[in-house]
Curated annotation (Swiss-Prot):
Pfam families: TYA. Keywords: Cytoplasm, Phosphoprotein, RNA-binding, Transposable element. Residues 429-440 have a biased composition (Basic and acidic residues). This is Transposon Ty1-GR1 Gag polyprotein. Residues 1-16, 153-165, 402-418 have a biased composition (Low complexity). Induction: Ty1-GR1 is a highly expressed element. Induced under amino acid starvation conditions by GCN4. It comes from Saccharomyces cerevisiae (strain ATCC 204508 / S288c) (Baker's yeast). Retrotransposons are mobile genetic entities that are able to replicate via an RNA intermediate and a reverse transcription step. In contrast to retroviruses, retrotransposons are non-infectious, lack an envelope and remain intracellular. Ty1 retrotransposons belong to the copia elements (pseudoviridae). The gene is TY1A-GR1. Homotrimer.
Length: 440
């Protein structure tokens, strides 16, 4: 009876559930809702079994699933079409995993979320070469780093060995603007140094200390793509990636060159602001030094016009060059070349006066020598007077002898006395004195 009623009302049924009820089910007096409930119980058992199997998976799968992350084994790659990482240039699965590291996956599958790191970047095993990332990964660039400073150090002198007590390494922040790339690359280089990769960083001469391996190149490529999204890269970085999308080493080398150039620019500005010149060095050398600094700054985009350059040069002049500050202040359109013409004129005048001073000194010395020779020639004259005096004394003695002989008697005794008295008495002394008769 019931089956007849069901057959009568089958033409007005509007659901597949009513039409699927059979006579066997009607004879058992079983409600169709009970069948659905039984099926629901089976589904619950199946889900419970799946959950129990899921708890036996490795600890890495216990990380909360990232809704933006696609599994590297099942999901399809969707790389940006307009960025510097084109799909046709992406690494294949074998190229991205040269050593069988399944946790890397395809580079295009790497999430860009700054708040959660996928377990695929955790190296397998406790003896992994690269460190794990803490939960603070992807913090903004303005967040202070726990490491001491973010200045770049030469990788050739930096110690790239990380101690076993340092379990975590702070990753670089997310790049959020092309203008922040110079500061971001400093933190990225610091991150590589703390990750035992200081030897692959290009040195000052542009070459690394050691050769980079395939695994390290993969790690370098993936981490660079994670923390430096393509839309925030500078134009010169995009140009390098458009030629070779894996040439991260060239980007690092160019960045280091720009760091050195920035340091040179700062040094040039400080040198130009602290110029000092007093003529102690050649004017040509001073002009070459100043013009090279100005040209280097202009080539690097720091324009130094003639007015500013002349003011900086004149401020450092001293000595005889100082008056150029007052004679040249009236010339508003004075150039650096005109200022150096005046400096050269003063320098040449100084050199001319210095060359004339040694000749004057030689004349003074000649006069001194002449005076010394004159005093030496007077000594023979003084010595020549002594024989003249002796001759005069002898003449006086002779005259006295004549007078005495004319007055004496012709006796022999008197003659002997007179002869004895007329003979001069020679004294053995250094003054060569002679005593006249009658004085003793």
């Amino acid at each position: 009876m019931e089956s007849q009623q069901l057959s009568q009302h089958s033409h007005i049924s509007h659901g597949s559930a009513c039409a699927s009820v059979t006579s066997k089910e009607v004879h058992t007096n079983q409600d169709p809702l009970d069948v659905s409930a039984s099926k629901t119980e089976e589904c619950e058992k199946a889900s419970t079994k799946a959950n129990s199997q899921q708890t036996t998976t490795p600890a890495s799968s216990a990380v909360p699933e990232n809704p933006h992350h696609a599994s590297p084994q099942t999901a399809q790659s969707h790389s940006p079409q307009n960025g510097p990482y084109p799909q046709q240039c992406m690494m294949t699965q074998n190229q991205a995993n040269p050593s069988g590291w399944s946790f890397y996956g395809h580079p295009s599958m790497i999430p860009y979320t700054p708040y959660q790191m996928s377990p695929m970047y955790f190296p397998p095993g406790p003896q992994s070469q690269f460190p794990q990332y803490p939960s603070s990964v992807g913090t903004p660039l303005s967040t202070p780093s726990p490491e001491s400073g973010n200045t770049f150090t030469d990788s050739s002198s930096a110690d790239s060995d990380m101690t076993s007590t340092k379990k975590y390494v702070r990753p670089p922040p997310m790049l959020t603007s092309p203008n922040d790339f110079p500061n971001w690359v400093k933190t990225y280089i610091k991150f590589l140094q703390n990750s035992n990769l200081g030897g692959i960083i290009p040195t000052v001469n542009g070459k690394p200390v050691r050769q980079i391996t395939d695994d390290e190149l993969t790690f370098l490529y993936n981490t660079f793509q994670i923390f430096a999204p393509s839309q925030f890269l500078p134009t010169w970085v995009k140009d390098i990636l458009s030629v070779d999308y894996t040439d991260i080493m060239k980007i690092l080398s160019k960045s280091i060159e720009k760091m050195q150039s920035d340091t040179q620019e700062a040094n040039d500005i400080v040198t130009l602001a602290n110029l000092q010149y007093n003529g102690s060095t050649p004017a040509d050398a001073f002009e070459t030094k100043v013009t090279n600094i100005i040209d280097r700054l202009n080539n690097n985009g720091i324009h130094i016009n003639n007015k500013v350059a002349c003011q900086l040069i004149m401020r450092g002049l001293s000595g005889e060059y100082k008056f150029l500050r007052y004679t040249r202040h009236r010339h508003l359109n004075m150039t650096v070349a005109e200022l150096f013409l005046d400096i050269h004129a003063i320098y040449e005048e100084q050199q001319g006066s210095r060359n004339s001073k040694p000749n004057y000194r030689r004349n003074l010395s000649d006069e001194k020598n002449d005076s010394r020779s004159y005093t030496n020639t007077t000594k023979p004259k003084v010595i020549a007077r002594n024989p003249q005096k002796t001759n005069n004394s002898k003449s006086k003695t002779a005259r006295a002898h004549n007078v005495s002989t004319s007055n004496n008697s012709p006796s022999t005794d008197n003659d002997s006395i007179s002869k004895s008295t007329t003979e001069p008495i020679q004294l053995n002394n250094k003054h060569d004195l002679h005593l006249r008769p009658g004085t003793y």
